[in-house]
Design a protein with these regions (language model features):
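Solvent-exposed, charged helical/coil patches
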Residues: 1-49, 133-135
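Conserved short-loop catalytic and cofactor-binding motifs
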Residues: 25, 53, 83, 87
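Amphipathic coiled-coil/heptad-repeat helices and related helical stalk/stem segments
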Residues: 34, 58-59, 92
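Active-site metal-binding core of divalent-cation-utilizing nuclease and nuclease-like domains
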Residues: 42-73
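Basic, amphipathic alpha-helical patches used to engage nucleic acids or provide basic targeting signals
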Residues: 62-128
Length: 135
């Protein structure tokens, strides 16, 4: 709680103080959700690619984290990019459909899921990898 006050941040009644403090500490440490998930995926899959392009011929889509051999697209969702505006939401759905038609499995995770349950997120990714490899 002291970190929150020292940084001049405000906590609403809807934000539990422990959660707000944890988020503040992570941000101060430079631990953004994409960095945390990238480190976890890369540790298990050295062939993983970040900001992957070329998944859909003729489209300039960029995948946050891609396992190209398995055709698994891992996306980190945040309201600042996905859903703040209706047009962005529609574009995101169109993009996901194009990826699916091209044979990609799209897994979407929020920052909250990554920070609160990285082990569960990693387990979901591993299950998808095993399914894609036919195991």
């Amino acid at each position: 709680m002291a970190d929150v006050k020292r940084l001049g941040l405000k906590i609403s009644a809807a934000t539990p103080p422990a959660r707000a403090t944890a988020l503040t500490v992570r941000r101060r440490a430079g631990r953004m959700p994409d960095e945390v998930l990238w480190a976890a995926v890369r540790a298990q899959h050295p062939h993983a690619q970040r900001e992957f392009e070329g998944a859909v011929p003729g489209r300039r889509y960029r995948i946050d984290i891609a396992l190209e051999a398995e055709k698994i697209a891992i996306e980190i969702d945040g309201w600042q990019y996905h859903g703040k505006f209706k047009s962005a939401h529609e574009t995101d759905r169109e993009r996901q459909n194009h990826l699916a038609v091209a044979g990609w499995l799209v897994l979407r995770f929020t920052a909250g899921q990554i920070f609160k349950d990285l082990q569960g997120v990693s387990a979901t990714i591993e299950k998808a990898v095993q399914q894609r490899r036919g195991q």
